[in-house]
Amino acid sequence: TYGIVHPREQWATQRDMRRSPFYAREEAAGAKFFDARGWERPQWFTSNEKLISKFKDACEARPHEWDARWWSPITNAEHLQMRESVGMVDLTAFNEFDFTGPGAMKFLQYMCVNNVDVEVGRSVYTPLLTPGGGFRGDLTIMRLSAEHFRVITGAFDGGRDNYWFKRHMPNDGSVTFTDMSSALCTIGVWGPNAEKTMAKIVTGDHKAFDVSQKNFPYGAVREVLIGGVPCTMFRISYVGENGWEVYTKMEHGLRLWDSIAKAGEEFGIIPVGMGVYAVTGRIEKGYRLMGAELESEYNPVEAGLNRPKVKSADFIGKAAYMKAREEKPCAIMCTLEMIDNKSKAGIKRYPTGGNEPILTKSGDRIVDAKGRVSRVTTAGAAPSLGKYLMLAYLTPEHAVEGNELRVMYMNELFPVRVARVGSQPLFDPTDARMKS
């Protein structure tokens, strides 16, 4: 006999290998820790269980044990509280790589699809490509000075990206690579009251610092003091809310956490788990994830991440990328919504995002011109929308808004509808909540 591994299954051994400086506060708040490449990372907090009664209509329990395994309705409550006020997320498992030296900008231009030659204090989102034009990485870059760039990549992507960058490093001494991942900790602060929270404690040159969008726009990076702690604030969001990623040295982390928590008390600030950051908040915005939507067999055009113009500088995968831009895509990333999730037995089911097949209305497989089968890459609740969503690549003929399809889950077909084609999200499609 053999066991079937749940897509969200957690390791039972070799735990507690890496802890953020916030661990004691998180443990006291009843964090349910998941493993993230050795890091203990909160998925949800039992201290937020009281919010279920506040948002009860959006926090239904899942009746089937398999669907409910490694999940909690607390996640939906945390999601809605953050959308209503403000939440703080432990992002210490991020990987941070510093590139410095006179050749740093030229090197990163060659590695990255998008233009990294931005002003100091600005940032850029960019994929990394394979020579064949598929996804090799997905990251953001902050320009901290003329010859200092900081690359931010995901918890599970650091080893791969570290290798890829080092493999292509020039050997003339013009670029220095420093892995800062074990030196820095990170807190995400997001929500309508994030600005009010941070305005109380952020200073620059020992005086109040204006954190408004006018002075501190989306994508900007600033060096500040927060509760006396030197920090790098980066205005960006992966959950579709106004706010920042805040970076500081590990030894300052606990004071930073306590300063933000105290400042946000009057707004009902809560700790928020990765169930919101990595699933519900992300899927409402249709954001792609490396290793899920972004894989080497798909390209930026298919993922809806191609930009209107391509930089003149050469980069890895450029020829293949230019060719893909000229051709009709074989597949398009889409957002699907479940129409009816009741099984034949009358039980509400919730696909886990474990590569469930997407089929035609008549139950036939959807296969693109390259032989790739349509499947669910991410699935999760969208509490702000009252929907259950999935992301999947579809062929152009099926990638039509309103088109009805089927998802196979536990050998049963459930009706789904194409809600969005491409990168436009269902939630806040103009990004007003993040950028105004």
Protein language model regions, located:
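Glycine/proline-enriched, intrinsically flexible loops and inter-domain linkers
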Residues: 1-436
